[in-house]
């Protein structure tokens, strides 16, 4: 990624969408795609797609579109998916167990390798391919395994305390499923997942944009 151009956050958040769609085209044997096809599939206007791609140099040619293999190579490099990304989950309640069972089954380059909880009846359980560890081992394990991405699914009342421990362990990215906002240093990225807001957004788009 260019060091001279600051990429908008909205563009960066769309990269995984583009990557997943282009990967699906590759699996179907398609070797090129244009911005209109991407637009129709992802419901993102073509101008936005072209602008997003323009931040990263010449990814396509006018009249030809984008080469699938070239796009995949580019997205993998930008998303740091050339190597396996190890992820930890903290809080193994119903949602945590569901995420462990799913464990990014459609993403070959990401996997949850560690899980932590405080409940004695959960610690030691094997869920999917992961054995749940005592939360007392959190900081030590994250440092040892060099894990810098964590999914947070704890109760809201302890979310900030756990977040502070994650920062202490060197974590740089937190996907926060707890209802409360957490405070972290500026170099730690937090993405808040509020299912209520996501559903409201979905209903809005269904009402206003469905044909």
From Swiss-Prot:
Q: Which biological process annotations from GO are given for this protein?
A: negative regulation of DNA-templated transcription; response to redox state
Q: What Gene Ontology terms describe what this protein does at the molecular function level?
A: DNA binding; DNA-binding transcription factor activity
Which sections of the sequence are annotated for DNA binding? Answer: 17-56
One protein family per Pfam: Put_DNA-bind_N
Family statement: Belongs to the transcriptional regulatory Rex family.
Task: Tell me which HAMAP family the record gives.
Answer: Rex
- Give the protein's recorded name: Redox-sensing transcriptional repressor Rex
The UniProt gene name for this protein comes to rex
């Amino acid at each position: 990624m260019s060091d001279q151009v600051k990429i908008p956050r909205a563009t960066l958040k769309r990269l995984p969408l583009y990557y997943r769609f282009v990967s699906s085209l590759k699996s179907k044997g398609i070797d090129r795609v244009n911005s209109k096809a991407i637009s129709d599939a992802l419901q993102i206007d073509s101008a936005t797609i072209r602008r997003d791609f323009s931040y990263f140099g010449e990814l396509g040619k006018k009249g030809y579109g984008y080469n699938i293999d070239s796009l995949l190579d580019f997205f993998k490099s930008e998303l740091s998916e050339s190597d396996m990304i190890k992820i930890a989950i903290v809080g193994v309640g119903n949602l945590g167990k569901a995420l462990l069972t799913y464990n990014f089954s459609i993403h070959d380059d990401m996997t949850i390798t560690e899980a932590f909880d405080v409940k004695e009846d959960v610690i030691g359980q094997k869920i999917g391919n992961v054995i749940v560890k005592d939360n007392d081992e959190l900081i030590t394990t994250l440092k040892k395994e060099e894990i810098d991405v964590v999914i947070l699914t704890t109760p809201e009342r302890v979310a900030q305390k756990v977040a502070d421990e994650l920062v202490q362990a060197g974590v740089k990215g937190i996907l926060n499923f707890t209802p409360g906002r957490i405070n972290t240093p500026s170099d730690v990225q937090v993405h808040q997942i509020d299912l209520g807001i996501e559903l409201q957004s979905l209903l809005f788009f269904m009402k206003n944009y469905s044909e």
